[in-house]
Amino acid sequence: MSLIKWSIDPTHSEIAFKVKHLMISTVTGQFKKFSLVGETETDDFNTARKIEFTADIDSIDTNNEQRDAHLKSADFFNGERHPQITFSGTKYEDKEDGKLYGDLTIAGVTRPVTLNVEFGGIATDPYGQTKAGFTVAGKISRKEFGITYGAVTETGGVLLGDEIKINAEIQLVKQVVEEKAAA
């Protein structure tokens, strides 16, 4: 039996999120520094044994430095105490509608989440590297992770929505194939 190790290709991947602002428009942000490692027994990912993802809070970018600084503060992600968001996959199902189950930790709070996954396939690039592509999407409640900042407008409206939409375009690079002795 072999064990295949995969890591993220950061130049061909992006991790983005969206949240309602004033309930009339959407603010989009992304994380510029992130990593993902995975282990599978085959190239089809149905045998995924490990999926570990991290995003650095300090790399958040919403195209507004003042807002980014506020998001890093204790009002939101508390980046000083919790410098990373982590996701640890527990199960992957590549059926008609792919699902990735795992534990997401934001600001020190861990919750189980289910993400929708579209497997784009496997290809070899011009440099001989084997790559796998995925689109990952999901929704979470920021309040379930203890992010409850909620300024109110002068008319009593909500400044920020609770629902956060996650969208990631992931390209993984096959790193190592290790032969494991049968147990």
What role is predicted for each listed range?
Residues 1-183:
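Low-complexity, acidic/polar, glycine-enriched regions of mature
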